[in-house]
A protein has these predicted regions:
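Alpha-helical transmembrane segments and immediately membrane-proximal extracytoplasmic
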Residues: 1-214
């Protein structure tokens, strides 16, 4: 929620609009002049370039989430949070970087730091770090189920009951807290609902059975 509010605040400041205008980010950018789009991108490049050079030169090393979950290397909380915050700042200005990586990194980095101070088995540490990353994804996109699936399929590589329960609880709680923090429950991407006839359902059932048996 903090990162979402930070990103929106930067967008509003840079492109001179507010939540009261009820504009999407794309619409807000489209209404400013070309020079007012160019200058923020130049500033974004400078901030991003200098920031990432400083992080990689003076930081403790950026460790990706999968490596942290595997237990091969620990994420440094300060370096990770700075790296994630820099991503959000550049995204707010107009960088094409995705905004979902930063909350996942920050959540996993902070959790890595916390679990080191408790007597927790390696297996439990991996589960907590993965669930923290999934919770970050759930919060930023308001999608607890998709985030739980991401946690299980991409990070934990397992579908056992224990992992499923932990992922669903963490992602669900993250989404609930984010909604209460004022981010709202707006669906990020809306899709037209297709009209499906009964033959599509029959085909899907048959195809699912064939794939499962194969």
């Amino acid at each position: 929620a903090s990162y979402t509010h930070l990103m929106h605040g930067i967008q509003h400041f840079v492109y001179n609009y507010s939540s009261a205008d009820h504009l999407s980010f794309g619409a807000a950018v489209a209404r400013v002049s070309p020079i007012e789009r160019l200058i923020p991108l130049i500033v974004c490049g400078v901030i991003g370039g200098v920031g990432w050079v400083l992080i990689h030169r003076y930081g403790k090393g950026v460790v990706d989430i999968k490596t942290a979950v595997s237990g091969k290397m620990d994420m440094n909380p300060i370096t990770t949070v700075l790296h994630a915050t820099l991503q959000i700042i550049t995204v707010g200005i107009g960088s094409p970087l995705g905004r979902e990586v930063a909350p996942r990194e920050a959540s996993a980095g902070i959790t890595t730091f916390l679990v080191k101070h408790f007597d927790i088995k390696q297996e439990d540490r991996q589960l907590l770090i993965a669930c923290a990353a999934g919770a970050g994804l759930a919060a930023v996109y308001n999608s607890p189920l998709s985030a739980a699936i991401f946690t299980l399929e991409t990070l934990l590589l397992t579908w056992n009951i224990r992992a499923m329960s932990a992922a669903l609880i963490c992602c669900g709680l993250a989404t609930f807290v984010t909604r209460q923090a004022g981010v709202g429950d707006v669906i990020q991407y809306t899709m037209a609902q297709p009209s499906l006839g009964s033959h599509y359902v029959e085909f899907s059932i048959a195809l699912g059975a064939i794939v499962a048996l194969g």
